Amino acid sequence: MYVPDVAEDLCLDIFHKQKQVISRYFANFHCDVVRQLTERLLCHQGAVFFSGIGKSGCIARKLVATMQSFGEKAFFLSGDLLHGDLGVVSSGDIVCLFSNSGETREILEWIPHLKNRQVFLVGITSSPCSSLAVFSDFVVMLPKLEELDPFNLIPTTSTTCQLLFSDLLAMTVLRCRKISLSDYGKNHPSGQIGLKANGKVRDYLSPRTEVPFCSPSITVSEALTVLSSYGYGCVCVVNEQFELLGIFTDGDLRRGLSECGGAILECPLEQVMTRKPKVISEDSDVLLGLEMMESGNPVTVLPVVDAQHQRFIVGLLHMHTLARAGLL
């Protein structure tokens, strides 16, 4: 029978237990082993294999997928290793095996055959005296923490620890490799990640034909007609060659009215415009544009300039456009 109050109490109890055990993980895990393992991976020329049985295997698969996404030669060894899959392993390869207990039967059966291949064996376990720890060339010792279930048997906390280690290792390798957004995007052309990683400003800008332009000599009063005719909240101040001289926004107008009153309406734009606004090149990554909008003094629109000269305006990049594209 479902009792809401009981379910709520149990949920809160498990939630607090999660917080406690995760805190103990961070207090007891020595991340220097990640540094050492990263250094070996960076110097390694061959393949790197990860594997595990059951839930540990799921964590190994996830780590492989993450590392492959930024170009690492990482592969998953299936449970059929001794039924032919051993053929992909070569001398000198690195093989990393996940086992919380360090006594997983299938894993222990693999070890002699992997040793015969002269691999560098990495054991990732929570049991320092386990067979996996003893026979490994390098050991990643994860904190031994109790599981969340009443029997202390169901892989919950242990797999969370494995996942935290995996993400730390993958991101350390990524940072050391100095993987750029462009590098990552080449391996991830599809989905929302692909849109963010590969999108260029030119793909999202409003073209020059839709940009509100004004001459620097017209008054603020005259510019208001242009400003109110478009939905950008700004006008771009340009010369006859469409070189960007500055920008005037509705925020500039409010500040001017507050400081100068109605007299600002008769001022020429060149006296009140922002002369060095944030701009972005049309061939820049769209995520750079989003970062520029949100950093410093936040803005919702960026003038886009040509890639060659970096001064002729070719369009506008608007926050609303990026939101509609699902990039926020």
Swiss-Prot record:
Q: Name one Pfam family in it.
A: CBS
What biological-process terms (Gene Ontology) are attached? carbohydrate derivative metabolic process; carbohydrate metabolic process
Query: What InterPro entries does the annotation carry?
Result: CBS_dom, CBS_dom_sf, KdsD/KpsF-type, SIS_dom, SIS_dom_sf, SIS_Kpsf
Quote the record's binding site residues for ATP.
52-57
**What are this entry's molecular-function GO terms?**
ATP binding; isomerase activity
Its domain of life reads: Bacteria
Domain (SIS) spans 37-179
Task: Using the record's annotation, list all stretches that form the CBS domain.
Answer: 205-264, 273-328
Matching entries from PANTHER family are given as: ARABINOSE 5-PHOSPHATE ISOMERASE-RELATED, PTHR47476
Would you tell me the protein name for this molecule? Answer: Uncharacterized protein TC_0679
Please give the organism: Chlamydia muridarum (strain MoPn / Nigg)
